[in-house]
C-alpha cells in the first residue's frame, strides 16, 4: 500500500521530508527494475499517460515516456508542433480536450511559470510538472537528490554548490528547495547578473567567486548558460564567462577530493564545463540520466497507485 497525500506533483514546494524520502526510496526500487534484463512491469497496466510538451526536451520527454512504458502504462506523446495549439488553441482548450479522453496522468512542460498548476485546476487526472518556465522542475531535483544519496549515502549535512545561470534556472530553484528540506547546505555561485532577487531568502548562501563557493563542497552542480532565455547582455562574452565560472580542473580543486560533478543537461562544453571534467572520474552526469527514469517511474506509481484516503491536492 502506498500512502501519498498529493494528487499532483507540481513542484518541490509543498513536499515534506517524508514525501521526498518516500519518492526516493521507491526510485531506488525502480533502479533495480531498470537494471534487470526484463525491464517491464504491469503496475500501471490499463492506465494512460499523456506527455504534453510545449517546449522541446529530448531527454526529459524520452525519460517520462520510458518510465511510463516500463510500468506498463499506455503512453501518448503529443507533438505540439503538429497540434491545434499551432492553430491558435489555448493551453486550457488543449488540456480540456485531452481531459475528455480520460487519461490518468498528464505530464506537462510549458514556457510559462504556473502552467502545470493551472492545468491541475482544470483536469480530473493527475498532473506532473515537467518544467514550467523559470519556476520549477521537480523531477530533476528528485533525480539529482537520488544521484547524490546513492553516491554519498545521505543528503543531510553535505555542501552542494550550484553554479552558473541561476537566474533562468528552474532546476536551481527546485534543487534549493529540496536540498534545504533534506538538511543540506546549499550555495549558489554566479555573477550578480545571473542571480535572481531574493535568492538568499530561499535558503542559499551566495558567492560570486568559484574558489570561495566551491571550497570543501561535496557536490558541484553546474547549470547550463540559457542563452535562449536571455533578453539582455547578462555576460560580456562566452569566453569570459568560462574563464570565471566554467568548471575546469583548476577550479574543481577547491572542492573536496571526492566531490561529485553534476549537470542537468544539455551541456555547453567549454562554456559552463570543460570536457575533461564532464567526462572525468568525478562526473555523475550519466548516472543522473539513469536516475531520471527511475525517479519518474516512482512518481507515476506513487501518484497513480496511492491508497491514501485523505485529501489529495
UniProtKB/Swiss-Prot annotation:
Residue sites binding L-aspartate per the record: 87, 170, 224
The keyword Nucleotide-binding is assigned to this record: no
Pathway stated in the Swiss-Prot or TrEMBL entry: Pyrimidine metabolism; UMP biosynthesis via de novo pathway; (S)-dihydroorotate from bicarbonate: step 2/3
Class in the EC hierarchy, top level: transferase
InterPro entries: Asp/Orn_carbamoyltranf_P-bd, Asp/Orn_carbamoylTrfase, Asp/Orn_carbamoylTrfase_sf, Asp_carbamoyltransf, Asp_carbamoyltransf_Asp/Orn-bd
GO cellular component: cytosol
E.C. number: 2.1.3.2
Pfam families from the UniProt entry: OTCace (PF00185), OTCace_N (PF02729)
Function: Catalyzes the condensation of carbamoyl phosphate and aspartate to form carbamoyl aspartate and inorganic phosphate, the committed step in the de novo pyrimidine nucleotide biosynthesis pathway.
HAMAP family: Asp_carb_tr
Stated name of the protein: Aspartate carbamoyltransferase catalytic subunit
Amino acid at each position: 500500500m502506498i500512502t501519498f497525500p498529493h494528487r499532483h506533483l507540481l513542484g518541490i514546494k509543498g513536499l515534506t521530508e517524508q514525501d521526498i524520502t518516500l519518492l526516493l526510496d521507491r526510485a531506488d526500487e525502480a533502479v533495480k527494475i531498470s537494471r534487470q534484463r526484463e525491464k517491464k512491469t504491469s503496475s500501471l497496466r490499463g492506465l494512460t499517460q499523456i506527455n504534453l510538451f510545449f517546449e522541446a526536451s529530448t531527454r526529459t520527454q524520452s525519460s517520462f515516456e520510458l518510465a511510463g512504458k516500463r510500468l506498463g502504462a499506455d503512453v501518448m506523446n503529443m507533438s505540439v508542433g503538429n497540434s491545434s495549439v499551432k492553430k491558435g488553441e489555448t493551453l486550457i482548450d488543449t488540456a480540456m480536450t485531452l481531459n475528455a479522453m480520460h487519461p490518468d496522468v498528464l505530464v506537462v512542460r510549458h514556457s510559462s511559470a504556473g502552467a502545470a498548476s493551472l492545468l491541475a485546476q482544470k483536469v480530473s487526472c493527475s498532473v506532473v510538472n515537467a518544467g514550467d518556465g523559470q519556476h520549477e522542475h521537480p523531477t530533476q531535483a528528485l533525480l539529482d537528490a537520488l544521484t547524490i544519496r546513492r553516491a554519498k549515502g545521505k543528503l543531510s549535512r553535505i555542501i552542494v554548490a550550484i553554479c552558473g545561470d541561476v537566474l533562468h534556472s528552474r532546476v536551481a530553484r527546485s534543487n534549493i528547495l529540496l536540498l534545504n528540506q533534506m538538511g543540506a547546505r546549499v550555495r549558489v555561485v554566479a555573477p550578480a547578473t545571473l542571480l535572481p532577487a531574493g535568492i538568499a531568502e530561499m535558503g542559499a548562501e551566495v558567492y560570486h567567486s568559484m574558489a570561495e563557493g566551491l571550497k570543501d563542497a561535496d557536490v558541484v552542480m553546474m547549470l547550463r548558460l540559457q542563452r535562449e532565455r536571455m533578453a539582455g547582455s547578462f555576460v560580456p562574452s562566452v569566453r569570459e564567462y568560462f574563464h570565471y565560472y566554467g568548471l575546469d580542473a583548476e577550479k574543481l580543486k577547491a572542492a573536496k577530493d571526492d566531490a561529485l560533478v553534476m549537470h542537468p543537461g544539455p551541456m555547453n562544453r567549454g562554456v559552463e564545463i570543460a570536457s575533461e571534467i564532464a567526462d572525468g572520474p568525478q562526473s555523475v552526469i550519466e548516472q543522473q540520466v539513469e536516475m531520471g527514469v527511475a525517479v519518474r517511474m516512482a512518481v507515476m506509481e506513487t501518484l497513480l497507485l496511492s491508497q491514501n484516503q485523505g485529501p489529495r491536492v
